[in-house]
Amino acid sequence: MKGIFPIDKFRTLQTPFYYYDTKVLRDTLSAINQEVAKYPSYSVHYAVKANANPKVLTIIRESGMGADCVSGGEIRAAVRAGFPANKIVFAGVGKADWEINLGLEYGIFCFNVESIPELEVINELAAAQNKIANVAFRINPDVGAHTHANITTGLAENKFGISMQDMDRVIDVALEMKNVKFIGLHFHIGSQILDMGDFIALCNRVNELQDKLEARRILVEHINVGGGLGIDYGHPNRQSVPDFKSYFATYAGQLKLRPYQTLHFELGRAVVGQCGSLISKVLYVKQGTKKKFAILDAGMTDLIRPALYQAYHKMENITSEEPVEAYDVVGPICESSDVFGKAIDLNKVKRGDLIALRSAGAYGEIMASGYNCRELPKGYTSDELV
């Protein structure tokens, strides 16, 4: 089954472009809010890194979510979209001074700190502004996630976070500082996780750390477990909204949250992944020695995930109902890795057909580049194309 698209409207637009189905997005946000409402101590922050399209951000902000940012630019994008500063968390292993100052000036909720040197800089910059910065420590729990190696973030070998062995020392340093307030612990073990067992392993590790801190009579107000929930790239129509019920219930059942604590989540891909498609036009159909190539006007500069992660995106010829044939679907970029998929079954392709690369709402438009001096793809919502 193919997706439903306003093809007549698409014909009037310059390809390639991103298309966001706002019904899918709003249904996803509604499903999240429905589940979170069961747990009054839960808060969700949208991971802006997944998609910072202003129209998409506005719809997410209207749902009541906070924002999870990893750069000063993302903080600005969130504020422009109307996210309250007191719902913004700022993570990232390499925060520049101007970015920290920006967060302080806006009065964001929390800095997720990844090292003692960073903590010292935040304390110094906060003192210069005569402010106290809320900080949580990103702990690397050494928990492996069943996902692509490039998007694991919770292993000891990864660059992210403070090791469990160093946690006590970092907390001791923070408690001596005058311009930071230690309010919580932060974790994030990876992305595109579909095995709830990975989240259970994280819960077990958080429980261990909580017990360790309580033995020192240190009470933590906030626990932030990051995000990581994946989507079904193979069947975007069958499961357009992820299983948020199981996701939040896993934490409710496994993480021993104290009565005074709040639990924070940072969801990105699961929020926007299924609402977006990259729409591209077929430039040529080329007969090779052993295969056919469908050459698109979209390439790895527009959607880098297949080249970077060997990621799969379901592809559909949305302008043909001819019999199915197999094609290697490639782009125009001068790189051998500019391949969206090999031996892909598509309704017979001809020049001018429109190909939809599905499940491209996350880490698609936001990761586009100008390599080969190409223009960045535009993004349109279904609200605009009625």
Swiss-Prot record:
EC number(s) per entry: 4.1.1.20
Record protein name field: Diaminopimelate decarboxylase
Class of this enzyme: lyase
Modified residues (N6-(pyridoxal phosphate)lysine): 49
Entries under Gene3D superfamilies matching the protein: Alanine racemase, Lyase, Ornithine Decarboxylase, Chain A, domain 1
Pfam families: Orn_Arg_deC_N (PF02784), Orn_DAP_Arg_deC (PF00278)
Purpose of the protein: Specifically catalyzes the decarboxylation of meso-diaminopimelate (meso-DAP) to L-lysine.
Gene for this chain: lysA
Cofactor(s) it depends on: pyridoxal 5'-phosphate
Catalytic activity: meso-2,6-diaminopimelate + H(+) = L-lysine + CO2
Pathway terms, separated by semicolons: Amino-acid biosynthesis; L-lysine biosynthesis via DAP pathway; L-lysine from DL-2,6-diaminopimelate: step 1/1
PROSITE patterns: ODR_DC_2_1 (PS00878), ODR_DC_2_2 (PS00879)
One GO BP: lysine biosynthetic process via diaminopimelate
Subunit structure: Homodimer.
Record: residues binding substrate: 269, 305, 309, 335, 363
Keywords: Amino-acid biosynthesis, Decarboxylase, Lyase, Lysine biosynthesis, Pyridoxal phosphate
Stretch forming the signal peptide: none
Origin superkingdom: Bacteria
GO molecular function, one term: diaminopimelate decarboxylase activity
